[in-house]
UniProtKB/Swiss-Prot annotation:
<keyword id="KW-0489">Methyltransferase</keyword>
<keyword id="KW-0949">S-adenosyl-L-methionine</keyword>
<dbReference type="InterPro" id="IPR029028">
    <property type="entry name" value="Alpha/beta_knot_MTases"/>
</dbReference>
<dbReference type="GO" id="GO:0002939">
    <property type="term" value="P:tRNA N1-guanine methylation"/>
</dbReference>
<dbReference type="Pfam" id="PF01746">
    <property type="entry name" value="tRNA_m1G_MT"/>
</dbReference>
<dbReference type="GO" id="GO:0005829">
    <property type="term" value="C:cytosol"/>
</dbReference>
<comment type="function">
    <text>Specifically methylates guanosine-37 in various tRNAs.</text>
</comment>
<comment type="similarity">
    <text>Belongs to the RNA methyltransferase TrmD family.</text>
</comment>
<comment type="subunit">
    <text>Homodimer.</text>
</comment>
<dbReference type="InterPro" id="IPR016009">
    <property type="entry name" value="tRNA_MeTrfase_TRMD/TRM10"/>
</dbReference>
<dbReference type="InterPro" id="IPR023148">
    <property type="entry name" value="tRNA_m1G_MeTrfase_C_sf"/>
</dbReference>
<dbReference type="InterPro" id="IPR029026">
    <property type="entry name" value="tRNA_m1G_MTases_N"/>
</dbReference>
<keyword id="KW-0819">tRNA processing</keyword>
<dbReference type="GO" id="GO:0052906">
    <property type="term" value="F:tRNA (guanine(37)-N1)-methyltransferase activity"/>
</dbReference>
<protein>
    <recommendedName>
        <fullName>tRNA (guanine-N(1)-)-methyltransferase</fullName>
        <ecNumber>2.1.1.228</ecNumber>
    </recommendedName>
</protein>
<keyword id="KW-0963">Cytoplasm</keyword>
<keyword id="KW-0808">Transferase</keyword>
Length: 236
């Protein structure tokens, strides 16, 4: 069964963007995943296709209108009644590999991409989307964040990555969720740097032990919370 995605955006022309290339692009051609993009501006109430307005209470920036966004959401829900509805926002749960895997369990997902200062809170109150963030920084809109989420999901779909070991041995999958070990390829020596001898030994047990140790060392140094389990890694 294909992975089906609907995007709600005021810039539909941004999609599929970089998802039209490499693994994701080939998977889109093969219909391993399907993309539908809905233009929120199509639901605007005036001839200028206005989707935003000044915030009540004052403040900087503009806010996406609840009536316009709500009509776009209602239109989507009339077709995709069982979709998993997601809103990309910096204040959401931080996205990770486990969430990417769990998203694939849904037959259809919808991602709402915000702009300006975000969407009217009443959209969140009325539709209770799952609020998702890709990190502690601000983008100009939710579209790039949505593409990041989709890229992480798509490469996990059967038939996208030919060598499944590439997935099971990478960061956040390898060794119970730690960072990946260092990788080396030809030439054997470069600018005085040599490939570790153990990787040239042909001893698979020693190579495996070395990789596990390196993963643990790197994770402890850069992301110790992954070892302590102090992260929210569930899609709830």
């Amino acid at each position: 069964m294909a992975f089906n995605v609907t995007i709600l955006s005021i810039f539909p022309e941004m999609f599929p963007g970089f998802l039209n290339y490499s693994l994701a692009g080939k998977a889109l051609e093969k219909k391993i995943w399907n993309l539908e993009v809905i233009n929120i501006r199509s639901f605007a109430k005036d001839k200028h296709s206005t989707v935003d307005d000044v915030p009540y209470g004052g403040g900087a920036g503009m806010v996406m209108r609840s009536d316009v966004v709500g009509d776009a959401v209602d239109s989507m829900l009339s077709v995709h009644k069982n979709t998993k509805f997601i809103y990309m926002t910096p204040s959401g749960t931080k996205f990770n590999q486990n969430i990417a895997r769990e998203l694939l369990e849904f037959p259809h997902i919808t991602i709402l991409c915000g702009r300006f200062e975000g969407i009217d809170q009443r959209i969140i109150d009325a539709y209770t989307p799952y609020e998702l963030s890709i990190g502690d920084y601000i983008l100009s809109g939710g579209e790039p964040a949505a593409m990041v989420v989709l890229d992480a999901c798509i490469r996990l779909l059967p038939g996208v990555v030919n060598n499944t070991d590439s997935i099971t041995e990478e960061s956040f999958n390898y060794g119970g969720g730690v960072l990946e070990y260092p990788q080396y390829t030809r030439p054997e020596q470069w600018k005085g740097y040599k490939v570790p001898e153990v990787l040239l030994s042909g001893n698979h047990k020693k190579i495996s032990d070395w990789r596990q140790k390196q993963s643990h060392v790197i994770t402890k140094k850069r992301r110790p919370e992954l070892l302590s389990g102090e992260i929210n890694d569930k899609f709830t």
